[in-house]
Structures are given as C-alpha cells and as structure tokens.
C-alpha cells in the first residue's frame, strides 16, 4: 500500500490542530479528515474519528500496523512541511469548507 496523493489545508484555530488532510491510497481509495496536531512531542497525525454517545472518540478508519501508520504520517507531515511557513499560506477557519 502506498500513499499516492495528499491534499492538505491548514486551519486557523485556538487549539492544537494545524491542518486537515485527505490522502489517496494506491490511486484507489480516499480517506478524508485526517488531522495534523501539534502535540507535546511535536506534530503527529490523528485519524478521522467520531464521538460516541458516552463522550469518547473512536477512530472511523485507522491503519492496523505501525508500518502503514508510519507511511501515512510521513506522507502527511512531509506535505505539511513542503508547504512551508504558515505566513505564506491562506488559512481556513476550522469547520469551513
């Protein structure tokens, strides 16, 4: 499995979310709403999730092994860094489409 495309838009929020990405796998399958989060130990990728009735968040889609998770995280964060400084980019308000 290869990540064959990454579409990323930065967001302007008060929280730790820095961007939202969509990835294409093997030119055949798209996963939307992957979040780039600025965590305590640096940037990381969070998979799409949904809040359960008891208030917990559960991933809707996720890789089942660390190798695949690494491929996805590397592809998304490489695109995030490729886009460069945030000053040169337009931001979208979180939740805007």
Curated annotation (Swiss-Prot):
Keyword Cell inner membrane set for record: no
Any GO BP annotation: sporulation resulting in formation of a cellular spore
Signal peptide: none
Paired cysteines (S-S): none
Pfam families membership: SpoVG
Keywords for the protein's UniProt record, in alphabetical order: Cell cycle, Cell division, Septation, Sporulation
Function comment: Essential for sporulation. Interferes with or is a negative regulator of the pathway leading to asymmetric septation.
Family assignment from sequence similarity: Belongs to the SpoVG family.
Name of the protein this chain belongs to: Putative septation protein SpoVG
Species, as recorded: Bacillus subtilis (strain 168)
């Amino acid at each position: 499995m290869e990540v064959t495309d990454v579409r990323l838009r930065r967001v302007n929020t008060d929280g730790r979310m820095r961007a939202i990405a969509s990835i294409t796998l093997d030119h055949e399958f798209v996963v939307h709403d992957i979040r780039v989060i600025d965590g305590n130990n640096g940037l990381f990728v969070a998979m799409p999730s949904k809040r359960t009735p008891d208030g917990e968040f559960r991933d809707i889609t996720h890789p089942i092994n660390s190798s695949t998770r690494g491929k996805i995280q590397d592809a998304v964060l490489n695109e995030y860094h490729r886009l460069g400084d945030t000053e040169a980019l337009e931001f979208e308000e979180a939740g805007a489409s």
